[in-house]
Design a protein with these regions (language model features):
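Extracellular glycan-interacting surfaces
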Residues: 1-104
Length: 104
């Protein structure tokens, strides 16, 4: 397909699944790179001004990818002990992110 899209899905127990062919085929990404093998990924969002930068909220905090979801790193923050259920990038200042949390 000439206009294949990258599609990602956060899963309960399988981390992040990524497709580079508009959903025809899928593979798990990020295992051992901040996402552990049975991660509960609750939310994915991309940075407004940097479309290859993606954030994931999981049961053990916040994760970041700078290459459209191919590789992931844990973000060191006070959120590391919380399940991140929701993420929003400020529409006026894309350097501000809001996170909704709870216990895993």
């Amino acid at each position: 397909m000439a206009n294949d899209m990258i599609v990602m899905v956060g899963t309960v127990g399988q981390g992040v699944m990524r497709s580079v062919d508009s959903g025809e085929t899928w593979r798990r990404v990020g295992i051992g790179q901040g996402i552990y093998s049975d991660a509960l990924v609750r939310v994915l969002t991309n940075h407004r001004s940097q479309p290859n930068t993606i954030f994931a909220g999981a049961d053990r905090g916040l994760l970041r990818s700078d290459d459209a979801g191919e590789t992931w790193q844990s973000v060191t923050s006070p959120l590391s002990d919380y399940c991140v259920w929701a993420l929003a990038i400020d529409p006026v200042d894309p350097n501000i992110m809001f996170a909704g949390t709870g216990t895993p």
